[in-house]
């Protein structure tokens, strides 16, 4: 059984077995008797590595044994192993030649937080969002068959990710094409079944064996000539399996379901995987694991220990903290509770982001008006549309990167019908160490083109609160997009006061240059304004724009500069350029925003500097354009 550890080691532990398993090829040379100790050492190494860098923690601890078993039984990387989401892939990275680079995890030019094809041949599919693994592995299985290759395809998906419709679309399709593939359900929340034990493990070994499979097919041929007898035999088998396993749904879809088995029992895992590796057709293995397994604090509180921050070295003085305001998500959570108290029609909807979007207090105070739909963004948006049709006032709290998954529902089910749905869009812009899969780089571009949509970008906490109220009372769909992290500590007015729609605010009057800021780069723009004696405008609204102010600024300044933490292509700056072009106004415009490439993981400050969105970068870009115009 796995050892249990109680502290994160500050000094690298001795790992004599892991030292001999730097790659899956080396791992497969170990004797099975050594694998239990390998699991203990790998768990310690993971604790040590993530303690140095920070990162996702609990999920990886829960799949130590499963990761070892998969690489031990299958011929990776020739056999294609696809991890869903990737939170659990740190042990996989350690075992696939990247152990010595784990100290660079989630750092600029270091290892990514998730599997990336460009990082290793063992990362067969890039992930970050959930529920994609089965579709990807199915595509690989089909490709192998068409190319005449014998390689296997394996998808590892969690019980949470299995709630998404995309996963079931793939589960439904795979039997139709007769794919030779394996889906491993990593059930770490006991959400499907708690029926795990010796009898279930024993049954899994029997049902996954080639002998059983051959006998079953032989019996089917014989008994098929006697329809009554075959039906009795089939029902008896299903009844016996149904008493022990919850696999009826997967069997009905056409999968050979095995499990549930203990995901921390290495001998059972290896024996079952070996049996299933040799079976044809779509195979489904249900393993039950414990999130945070082997680390006592994470086992006791898996939510808190889902991810951790970097630990400071022993004896080091605590890093000084700059005074900051509340997190933007906290501002939203407080506003939601305040507005719910004022309006009983309000409902709050989230796709499995209660903690991240700060709906915890709302869920406790208003449980009947709180809806966590799990990882089902499409359903979340159309659920809100249905509520709005009946006079409720739904607020959808969702990360920018995940709203992309429900774009059709946003247009077809909400916007076309002009329904009153407010989208509180968290994690807009660059998010730091999680990298491009989690960045909110495109929401202004894909929202502002939707007819009737109100789109707002706050520059501080108080402005955000007022924008949420503005959007809530707006007749039609509205969106407030705000970044990860804390604001500049603006004084927050407790009242639920809206803003005048489409009205920008001039924060500094200058000459020659006008900086038009959409969002949280306002402090940096004010620094540049002081350095260049430039006008600085908090634009607030991306749609509708403050057209009267834009006409005035275009007529009184020699250069307009738009600043946004969104893709330059199609973003707020594009809206300004389109408006001026339609007005027939010819004025030089400089667009500053996210470039036409994916900005890789790093600290947020490093990413902003790379994109020229810090104060220094904005000033350099403006001076360069003025020089090019002969206006320096």
From Swiss-Prot:
It catalyses: D-glyceraldehyde 3-phosphate + pyruvate + H(+) = 1-deoxy-D-xylulose 5-phosphate + CO2. GO terms for molecular function: 1-deoxy-D-xylulose-5-phosphate synthase activity; magnesium ion binding; thiamine pyrophosphate binding. Pfam families: DXP_synthase_N, Transket_pyr, Transketolase_C. Its EC number is 2.2.1.7. Binds 1 Mg(2+) ion per subunit. Binds 1 thiamine pyrophosphate per subunit. CDD domains: TPP_DXS, TPP_PYR_DXS_TK_like. Pathway: Metabolic intermediate biosynthesis; 1-deoxy-D-xylulose 5-phosphate biosynthesis; 1-deoxy-D-xylulose 5-phosphate from D-glyceraldehyde 3-phosphate and pyruvate: step 1/1. InterPro entries: Dxylulose-5-P_synthase, THDP-binding, Transketo_C/PFOR_II, Transketolase-like_Pyr-bd, Transketolase_BS, Transketolase_C. One of its GO terms (cellular component) is cytosol. GO terms for biological process: 1-deoxy-D-xylulose 5-phosphate biosynthetic process; isopentenyl diphosphate biosynthetic process, methylerythritol 4-phosphate pathway; terpenoid biosynthetic process; thiamine biosynthetic process. Mg(2+) binds at residues 159, 188. Its cofactor is Mg(2+); thiamine diphosphate. Keywords: Isoprene biosynthesis, Magnesium, Metal-binding, Thiamine biosynthesis, Thiamine pyrophosphate, Transferase. The keyword Metal-binding applies. Homodimer. HAMAP family: DXP_synth. Catalyzes the acyloin condensation reaction between C atoms 2 and 3 of pyruvate and glyceraldehyde 3-phosphate to yield 1-deoxy-D-xylulose-5-phosphate (DXP). Belongs to the transketolase family. DXPS subfamily. This is 1-deoxy-D-xylulose-5-phosphate synthase.
